[in-house]
Swiss-Prot record:
The chain crosses the membrane at residues 25-45, 133-153, 164-184, 211-231, 248-268, 318-338, 343-363, 383-403, 409-429, 437-457, 465-485. Residues 46-132, 185-210, 269-317, 364-382, 430-436, 486-506 are lumenal. This is Probable dolichyl pyrophosphate Man9GlcNAc2 alpha-1,3-glucosyltransferase. Keywords: Endoplasmic reticulum, Glycosyltransferase, Membrane, Transferase, Transmembrane, Transmembrane helix. Belongs to the ALG6/ALG8 glucosyltransferase family. The keyword Membrane applies. The lineage of its organism: Eukaryota, Fungi, Dikarya, Ascomycota, Taphrinomycotina. GO terms for cellular component: endoplasmic reticulum membrane; fungal-type vacuole membrane; Golgi apparatus; lumenal side of endoplasmic reticulum membrane. Probable dolichyl pyrophosphate Man9GlcNAc2 alpha-1,3-glucosyltransferase that operates in the biosynthetic pathway of dolichol-linked oligosaccharides, the glycan precursors employed in protein asparagine (N)-glycosylation. The assembly of dolichol-linked oligosaccharides begins on the cytosolic side of the endoplasmic reticulum membrane and finishes in its lumen. The sequential addition of sugars to dolichol pyrophosphate produces dolichol-linked oligosaccharides containing fourteen sugars, including two GlcNAcs, nine mannoses and three glucoses. It catalyses: an alpha-D-Man-(1->2)-alpha-D-Man-(1->2)-alpha-D-Man-(1->3)-[alpha-D-Man-(1->2)-alpha-D-Man-(1->3)-[alpha-D-Man-(1->2)-alpha-D-Man-(1->6)]-alpha-D-Man-(1->6)]-beta-D-Man-(1->4)-beta-D-GlcNAc-(1->4)-alpha-D-GlcNAc-diphospho-di-trans,poly-cis-dolichol + a di-trans,poly-cis-dolichyl beta-D-glucosyl phosphate = an alpha-D-Glc-(1->3)-alpha-D-Man-(1->2)-alpha-D-Man-(1->2)-alpha-D-Man-(1->3)-[alpha-D-Man-(1->2)-alpha-D-Man-(1->3)-[alpha-D-Man-(1->2)-alpha-D-Man-(1->6)]-alpha-D-Man-(1->6)]-beta-D-Man-(1->4)-beta-D-GlcNAc-(1->4)-alpha-D-GlcNAc-diphospho-di-trans,poly-cis-dolichol + a di-trans,poly-cis-dolichyl phosphate + H(+). Its main location: endoplasmic reticulum. It comes from the Eukaryota. It is found in: Endoplasmic reticulum membrane.
């Protein structure tokens, strides 16, 4: 780490202005204001489905769920308007949509969420309201646990400047900001609940961690990416260093209680009819192995081997399940054998990358899940990991380029990506010659493909050629990041094993 911050990265120079005792209290207000300012700059641009009837896009889906939950009995939430952005997220998302719908309807403009007639409604005022709900959710739910995580690891990075420079880079990661505040979604809520779970694991508050993770699952089903690692970590704490059966029972009761609480209206009314419909909507296996062009194994393989023409849907489900289990097994076993806090982020990252690369029904935006635990590794203070974390972030936002380009967010994309890499001096390379070559190759590949996409139209015979190139390079990069997280996890766990063995011998 640099000791003379004035010669360091711009983010270090910024933080160093607050390192005096009299100025430290100003740092976090300035950080929050800077984050909100950036979110609003992104929000000025268009969103998913802007002015594109008849179905519009994710913005209309989120608005419609507010309309639907506002005017429809709870028992019909998962039955109504299935052809017009029917509700396909778990109940906590529905509750949040209802809450925001109540605020918009009664305190601002009822036309925004009028039953049926508001479909496709677009106005500057509605856009301002919807954008505000995402920003508020981001600040209230995601930012606090990230700050706690950074502070908890401050014992590894006692220096005020280095510690908070890392926090800034995590808070300003381009992929999440562009998807939530540009494209328009509420991923920050689910990711924030996951971070609250991780924060409570750091505090040994296992019941609270279980509760928050169950909330994440009931907000977005994609939080399942983290279910195996957190399960095996918690299971490990129940049997090591000694068996704690009472803890296992308490955690099990917490899971049952949380899901029962969230699902209570449907359980109370008619669980035999309503719960199966919720499961059917939340897990739409009939949609296929993936949607659109996504940088995972199956979509990449499909460019040379048409797997959907060879295997049935059921066979693909089984095959993807086997591949996913194989990819997440090592990290889950390590977290079970060594439930240590220093392994949490790496274990979550490795398992969620495995899920993203090999699981069934993956969206391109799902890359935000493995990107979160990968990014928070910056807070651990190991400078040798920075090149890989930076590469993961740049690959993630690069893989989202076709979607963001479609949304008309090209200006926001390039501005934010260039700014993030510049302020954090993120385009750095490992000292290892092989690693340096791999990292440099991916950066060159991204620049070349972006240049081609911007200035050369694809052949009429292959209109998706540039997208396929993007998917192929991104998959190769993500698989490399997966191998890196797994390799690092194995390395640290082997050192832990050696240390434990030496203690026993002593």
């Amino acid at each position: 780490m640099l000791s003379e911050f004035e010669n360091g990265a711009p983010v270090q120079q910024f933080v160093s202005r607050f390192r005096s005792y009299s100025s430290k209290f100003l740092f976090f207000p300035c950080l929050i204001m800077s984050l909100v300012f950036m979110q609003w700059l992104i929000s000025i641009g268009p969103y998913s489905g802007y002015n594109t009837p008849p179905m519009y896009g994710d913005f209309e889906a989120q608005r419609h769920w507010m309309e639907l939950t506002l005017h429809t009995p709870v028992s019909q939430w998962y039955f109504r308007d299935l052809q017009w952005w029917g509700l396909d997220y778990p109940p906590l998302t529905a509750y949040v949509s209802w809450f925001f719908g109540i605020i918009g309807h009664y305190f601002f403009n009822p036309e925004w969420f009028a039953d049926v007639t508001s479909r496709g409604f677009e106005s500057l005022e509605l856009k301002l309201f919807m954008r505000s709900t995402v920003i508020a959710s981001h600040l209230l739910i995601l930012v606090p646990p990230l700050m706690f995580y950074s502070k908890w690891w401050s014992r590894r990075i006692p220096n005020f400047v280095d510690r908070n420079a890392s926090l800034i880079m995590v808070l300003f990661q381009p992929a999440l900001l562009l998807i939530d505040h540009g494209h328009f979604q509420y991923n920050c809520v689910m990711l924030g609940l996951v971070m609250y779970a991780i924060a409570n694991l750091l505090k040994n508050q296992y019941v609270a961690a279980t509760f928050f993770f169950c909330l994440a699952l009931t907000f977005k089903q994609m939080a399942l990416y983290f279910a195996p690692p957190i399960f095996f970590y918690l299971l490990g704490t129940c049997v090591k260093p000694k068996i704690r059966f009472s803890r296992f029972i308490l955690l099990s009761v917490t899971v049952v209680f949380t899901f029962s609480l969230i699902l209570f209206p449907w359980i109370y009314m008619d669980y035999k009819t309503l719960l199966p419909q919720i499961l059917h909507r939340v897990f739409p296996f009939a949609r296929g192995l993936w949607e659109d062009k996504v940088a995972n194994f199956w979509c990449t393989l499909n460019t040379v081997f048409k797997i959907r023409e060879v295997f049935t849907l059921h066979q693909l489900q089984v095959i993807s399940l086997i591949f996913t289990l194989i990819s997440i097994l090592p990290s889950c076993v390590i977290l079970f054998l060594y439930p240590r806090k220093r392994l949490l982020a790496l274990g979550f990252a490795s398992a969620s990358w495995g899920f993203f690369l090999f699981s069934f029904q993956v969206h391109e935006k799902s890359v935000l899940l493995p990107l979160l635990p990968t990014s928070i590794l910056l807070c651990h203070g190991n400078i040798t990991t920075k090149p890989w974390i930076a590469l993961a972030n740049n690959l993630a936002v690069f893989s989202l380029w076709p979607l963001l380009k479609k949304d008309g967010l090209g200006l926001q994309y390039f501005t934010l990506v260039l700014m993030w890499n510049w302020i954090g001096d993120m385009v750095v390379f490992s000292k290892n010659v092989l690693f340096r070559f791999i990292q440099l190759s991916f950066y060159v590949g991204m620049i070349v493909i972006l240049g081609i996409d911007l200035f050369i139209p694809p052949p009429s015979r292959y209109p998706d050629l540039w997208v396929i190139l993007n998917v192929t390079l991104s998959f190769a990069g993500f698989f490399t990041i997966y191998l890196w997280t797994l390799g690092r996890l194995l390395h640290i766990s082997s050192k832990l094993s050696t240390d434990l063995r030496n203690k026993k011998e002593a």
